[in-house]
Amino acid sequence: MDLHSAIRKSKYFGFGVSPSCTGNVRKPEFFAFLAQTKLGAITLSDIPSSTFSWYTGEFYESQSITLELGKVARFGENDHKLLQPTFDAISELISIDGYKDIEFDESDIDIYKSTRTLFKKTNDFHFTFDAGVPNFTFFEKGIHLASDNGQEYYAAEGGEAVVFPNPNVQIGHRTCMLMQPTQIKIVNNQVMKS
């Protein structure tokens, strides 16, 4: 697990980004554990990334995830009570007795699928919305999201939620991830989007 605090506000106090790897890094038992942390959501990435969770999942087939817990604040200003379920779940996971065997119930957590990732192609890239919007801000189908030197981006069929919007990245880097709520299915002991 790669633990972070988000730079911006979010619809969810905590959420996870599950990497897209060639191995089985999305076992139902792991998702059951994640639900015990009381995360609000898990996003299912669909492309490789430069994260620690992707690297360990891809090269070591570990159950990997990046957790965004709360929002960055000055030391001592975060409400640690909100982190207690995560602390308790991790403590139980690493205890001598091991983690209790529980079934994953997808109703315990919101699941999102990645619909696409926008990358900055030129220095003309800009969002048409305030880049400071909270993670998981939802845009209805057809809403103009961004422009990049004549390339226009609109919210897709069914609408899309934006995660990690940042127009100030270098050319070639991710400016945001776009997501939609999804149902899941278990295939070969792996959680997959329906």
Predicted regions and their residues:
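Structured catalytic-domain cores with a bias toward divalent-metal coordination
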Residues: 2-194
